[in-house]
Regions:
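Alpha-helical solenoid scaffolds in eukaryotic macromolecular assemblies
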Residues: 1-195
Length: 195
């Protein structure tokens, strides 16, 4: 009831305290339900951090294998950058569980959101993963995906530049109506025929 009218930017500490209360005096499952509810009830800026907290508590209370559902829900609900970060973390978890193919698929998914020139972290993680666990074919596939993502990012940048160049430039100077303006307000009108 305390959280029904609580603004989302202030809800995070209340959810965490409520979950810890359930952990200490209640049931672990109820605490996890509180943390799940917190992922929807906090401000958008805190959602990724809340998902990470929920995943850590799930691993602690019921085991690492149960974190899969939380990761999958987080990836589907967060924006591109959050999904990229959570997918890369999920790949590490899958690798700990011995699921090499699932980890590779998650890294491939996360890499779709990261331009190799501006955000190389995921690409370095995938590169290191393929060096340790991959084959020549899987490494070549990683390089192919990397070129594809780079090309898509370049195309998107080019389209944005073209769109910006099409927009009219607004002048900071006021526009003067030349039809009513005179060069010299003291000018005397002289008829040329009289000369």
């Amino acid at each position: 009831q305390a959280l029904d009218g609580c603004p989302s930017e202030y809800a995070k500490p209340v959810f965490v305290a409520y979950g810890q209360l359930e952990e200490t005096y209640g049931l672990a499952r109820r605490a996890l339900r509180v943390y799940e509810r917190a992922t929807r009830g906090v401000a958008n800026a805190d959602r990724l951090e809340m998902y990470r907290f929920y995943i850590a508590k799930t691993a602690e209370l019921v085991g690492v294998a149960h974190t899969r559902a939380v990761y999958e829900r987080g990836i589907s609900e967060l924006g591109d950058m959050g999904a990229m970060q959570l997918s890369a973390e999920y790949a590490q978890t899958e690798l700990q569980l011995g699921e090499v193919d699932r980890a590779r698929a998650l890294l491939a998914y996360a890499a779709q959101f990261a331009d190799p020139r501006t955000d190389p972290r995921v690409w370095q993680q995938w590169h290191d993963f393929e060096v340790q666990h991959g084959s020549e074919d899987s490494f070549k596939e990683m390089l192919r995906v990397k070129r594809s993502v780079q090309a898509r990012a370049t195309d998107a940048r080019h389209l944005a530049e073209v769109e910006l160049s099409k927009q009219p430039v607004k002048s900071k100077k006021p526009v003067v109506d030349l039809s009513t303006a005179t060069a010299n307000p003291d000018e005397v009108a002289i008829d040329d025929d009289d000369l």
